[in-house]
Amino acid sequence: MVTKMKMPKVDKIILLVGLMGSGKTSVGKRLARKLSLPFVDGDQEIEKAAGLSLVDVLKCFGEQEYRAGEERVMKRLLKGAPCVLASGGGSFVAEQTRTLAKENALTIWLKADINTLYHRTAGRTRRPFLLGDNETVKNKLQKYITEEYPYYSEADIVVETRDERVENTVRHVIAAIHKFYHKAEKKKRRENAPEQQNGGADASAGNHSEC
């Protein structure tokens, strides 16, 4: 008999971060359904704001303006209502985005190795930063891993994503959210315990002096 996994109660934005091909969109859509939250795709929001595809935004305006637009969109989204938000690839590298995420969101890094990323991204034409032949794509992925993984490591939760069914990854994410909130609650109780003890001691001392 398969037991149904209890869903955590989430009252803030869940921000999925990671490199292109880490599964932010596919995992995010299913996670949002499980948690009864809306799903927002950062890349699609960038395309909507620009009125162009990601490839055309990069082609017409260059990487600097592409990143600036990405940062503006993420700033708006991170000030919004609770949802599951798949970040634009690379957006978490921006300091402003990371700061806002730490204030307003629970950040989850979908961490994948280079072989998984390559398998999921090779030959895809919608990813403007990963265009080229197979060797070029692999070299670019390795470069992004080296440059960006230190930023992603600042996320609240890290979930390793492998070449497995999306539903399995979603279960890992939900279990990690449960664990994160349980740990945070235990820490909060420990921090409050000394205050309660001191309060009890003060009350006892006060009663003793009145006798």
Locations of regions flagged by a protein language model:
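P-loop (Walker A) phosphate-binding loop of NTP-binding proteins
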Residues: 19
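Walker A/P-loop
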Residues: 25
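ATP-dependent small-molecule kinase phosphotransfer cores
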Residues: 41-91, 95-102, 126-127
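A glycine- and Lys/Arg-enriched "phosphate-lid" helix/loop adjacent to the NTP-binding pocket
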Residues: 103-149
